[in-house]
Structures are given as C-alpha cells and as structure tokens.
C-alpha cells in the first residue's frame, strides 16, 4: 500500500505540473459561453498546453501503476495533493511569493489527508469488476455528470458554471480511475492481449479525454475559488465511494469514522483556504479578483 501512495503522490505531482501549464494555455485562447470543440483545436496550437498534456499522460501512467498496487479508495484521495503541489510548482516556475496563509492551508491539507487515509485504511477488495456491475455505475455517474454539464450551460460565466463543470470533470476523473483499475487487473491476470481487447481500456481513455475537455472548459468558465474545490473534493469523495461500492474495499468503521471525518474536514478547510489565496491564482497564471484581501497582510 505504501508503494501505491508513493506512486499516487508522484502522479499528483505530474498532474499539478500539467495543470499549471494547461491553465496558462487556456487563458491564451478565446473564451466562449458554450462548449466548443474548437477549444481543443486552439489549444493544440499552443506549445504550453501540449507540454501540460505530457504531464497529464505521465500522471496517467503513474496512476495506473498506483491502482495496480493499491486500492481505489486510497489512490484517488491522494490526488488532493495536486492542489498544494500546484502552489509549489507554479511558485517556482512563475517566481510567485507564497504567503504564510497559503503554507498554513497546505499544512491543513497534508495533515487532514494523512489522518483521513490512516483512519479509513481500506482493506480487501478485488482487482477488477465484473461487467454487470458497470451498468448501474456508468448510468448513475454518467447521469449526474450530464446533469452538471446541463446546469453549467444554463448559467453565465462565473462561480456556478465553473463549479458545475469542474464537478463534472471530477466525476469523470474518478470513473476513469475505476475503469483504469479494472483494466490493470485484466492486464495482470490475463495479459496484454486481454488488456487491449477489454472495453474498460477504451472506456477509461474516452472518459478521461472527455474529463480533460470539461476541465479545460471549467478553467475558462470562472474563478479558481469555484472550480478547484469542486474538482479536488468531488474527485476524492467519488473515488472512495466507487472503491467501496464496486471494488468492495472495506474501510475501518467505529471510532475510526470520527477521525476520518475530522481529517476530511481539515483538508476541506485547507482546500477552500488555499483556493482563496491570490498566490495560488498567480501560480496557476490567473487573474483572481476574488482572492482573500487579508492574505497580503499575513504575507
């Protein structure tokens, strides 16, 4: 399990680098009030975005390895580290001063995540999910994701639109991870031929691409304080739920649940606090007017 956590943390680091570069690229192309495939064409002409995609691909490879060695309910929450890592990487790349308030938020995320994972400590589970289990999973997850996208399209550019699109992307990310874990289980059990013949392999690639498109759109739709918490927290919670329900991973219960809730509350506070800091917005190369005005007083 320790190896899975390390690989997941490396995947989060690679994804954070990709996010920093994608965010910068997304703000250099024309914004739109609708979902347009031309956005991808514009981004493909942007070298910075292509470099970000390399980071995302490396992240996917590391994530697949992490899922092969560990449970979905452990691996997916580790991606919460992507947010503080974006602060560290973006600060180094763009020479942004990180305030004391931002480092406090990072500490809350790290401690909260450690407490959450230690308290849950899921055990057991299976390496892949039989086909019939995927029918309700895909219908429910896809239905909620579609509802979020439709809700976003009915709203103007701003907080609600960005949050809905980011939450939809997060659901897609968690579902991609669940499908990826099954594909890796098939690879380990039946070999390369079965891996490339399984529908899960192509499903996780397609849903992952859709999630990437939704995330790029969410980045244009509104401020970071709306999109980042929705993306980060929805991904983690959905990953745990899918791990327990379809992979039959068994978290600890009893008093451990109280500690897990406390840990999740602490990391949630850290995510929202960090998302409100101006230095994170600058690290992701945005222009956030909604950042906490008190931050400069505590820098």
Where are these regions (language model features)?
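Polytopic alpha-helical membrane proteins, predominantly small-molecule transporters/carriers
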Residues: 1-299
């Amino acid at each position: 399990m320790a190896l899975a956590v390390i690989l997941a943390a490396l995947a989060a680091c690679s994804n954070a680098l990709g996010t920093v570069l994608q965010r910068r690229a997304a703000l250099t192309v024309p914004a739109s009030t609708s979902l347009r495939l031309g956005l991808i064409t514009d981004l493909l002409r942007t070298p910075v975005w292509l470099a970000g995609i390399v980071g995302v691909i490396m992240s996917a490879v590391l994530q697949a390895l992490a899922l092969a060695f560990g449970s979905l309910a452990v691996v997916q929450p580790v991606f919460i580290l992507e947010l503080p890592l974006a602060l560290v990487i973006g600060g180094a790349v763009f020479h942004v001063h990180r305030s004391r308030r931002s480092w406090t938020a990072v500490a809350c995320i790290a401690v909260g995540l450690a407490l959450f994972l230690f308290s849950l400590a899921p055990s057991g589970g299976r390496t892949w999910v039989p086909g019939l289990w995927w029918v309700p999973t895909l219908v429910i997850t896809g239905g909620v994701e579609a509802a979020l996208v439709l809700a976003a399209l009915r709203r103007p550019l701003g907080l609600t639109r960005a949050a809905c699109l980011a939450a939809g992307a997060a659901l897609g990310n968690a579902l991609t991870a669940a499908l990826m874990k099954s594909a890796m289980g098939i690879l380990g059990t039946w070999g390369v031929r079965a891996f490339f013949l399984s529908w899960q392999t192509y499903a996780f690639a397609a849903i992952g691409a859709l999630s990437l498109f939704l995330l790029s759109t969410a980045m244009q739709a509104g401020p970071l304080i709306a999109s980042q918490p929705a993306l980060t927290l929805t991904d983690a919670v959905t990953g745990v739920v899918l791990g327990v329900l379809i992979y039959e991973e068994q978290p600890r219960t009893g008093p451990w649940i109280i500690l897990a809730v406390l840990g999740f509350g602490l990391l949630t506070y850290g995510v929202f606090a960090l998302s409100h800091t101006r230095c994170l917005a600058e690290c992701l190369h945005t222009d956030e007017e909604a950042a906490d005005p008190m931050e400069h007083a505590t820098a």
